[in-house]
Regions:
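Nucleotide-activated donor-binding/catalytic signature segment of Leloir-type glycosyltransferases, i.e.
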Residues: 88-110
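Conserved donor-binding/catalytic core segment of Leloir-type glycosyltransferases
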Residues: 10, 35, 41-60, 65-73, ...
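Short alpha-helical donor nucleotide-sugar binding micro-motif in glycosyltransferases
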Residues: 111-116, 135, 209
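Short hydrophobic beta-strand element within catalytic cores of glycosyltransferases
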Residues: 140-145, 150-153
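Donor nucleotide-sugar binding/catalytic pocket of nucleotide-sugar-dependent glycosyltransferases
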Residues: 1-40
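A charged, aromatic-enriched C-terminal amphipathic alpha-helix characteristic of glycosyltransferases
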Residues: 169, 183-223
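Acidic donor-binding loop of glycosyltransferase active sites
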Residues: 114-126, 139
Length: 224
């Protein structure tokens, strides 16, 4: 009954729009959240390390990323920024090739995002801002192919790819995705990543949200 009283549903992704329809049988309009893409800077001199950052809680799957690099890629470097209740567990999983930096200030995060070879994103998110912050830094994303990531990252089948996906949250599947990325890294340009990230800018959000409110207000005025 409460849902029937809602004038307009706004979803943060098409993924959530489908969920709204499934639960409430109501259509919604998708307005992606604002990403402050201009706060990040591009670096064309990528260094030979992979990167991830997140609050260390179970659904973020940082343990999966660390375990994958420890077991499958002992000669590849992974740097992790973030803290949380799973930090000790993840530290115990980490091999010598994995560096855990814990919580860091934004400038340190920004620096690593711009220099990384790729950003690893293993969570299923309703939207997911971190992959777009990586792309705003000119950095490709290797992401779990479910949820909002499918709308914010352009896979290898796109004319201007910005990353690629893995289909299962397992060490084996992520291992295959990283190996595939290594073979196709030259197909992904920093410029394509930045252009894609700009589609989700904070100015775009303000314009879309204002237009929605203005349109709804005009319609309401016509009906009173």
């Amino acid at each position: 009954r409460t849902a029937n009283g809602v004038d307009k549903f706004i979803a943060i992704s098409n993924f959530i729009a489908r969920r709204i329809y499934k639960v409430y049988r109501r259509e919604s309009v998708t307005i992606y959240p604002p990403v402050y893409v201009d706060d990040f800077s591009i670096s064309h001199l990528k260094e030979d390390f992979y990167f991830t950052s997140s609050r260390m809680v179970p659904y973020k799957k940082i343990d999966l990323i660390v375990e994958t690099f420890t077991k499958s890629f002992p000669n590849k470097k992974l740097i992790v920024i973030g803290d949380g209740p799973e930090f000790k567990k993840i530290k115990d999983l980490a091999g010598k090739n994995v560096t855990l930096l814990g919580y860091q200030k934004f400038d340190i995060l920004k620096d690593h995002l711009s220099r990384a070879k790729a950003f690893i994103f293993a969570a299923e998110e309703d939207f997911g801002i971190s992959p777009l912050e990586a792309q705003a830094s000119g950095t490709p994303v290797i992401a779990f192919g479910k949820g909002g990531a499918l709308e914010t990252i352009r896979g290898l089948d796109d004319d201007d790819p910005t990353g690629l996906f893995f289909t299962e949250q397992t060490v084996d599947n992520l291992t295959k995705a990283i190996s595939l990325f290594e073979k196709n890294v030259d197909k992904i340009s920093a410029e394509s990543c930045v252009v894609n990230a700009q589609r989700f800018s904070d100015s775009r959000f303000r314009n879309e949200f204002k237009k929605l409110v203005d349109d709804e207000y005009k319609e309401w005025k016509l009906n009173i």
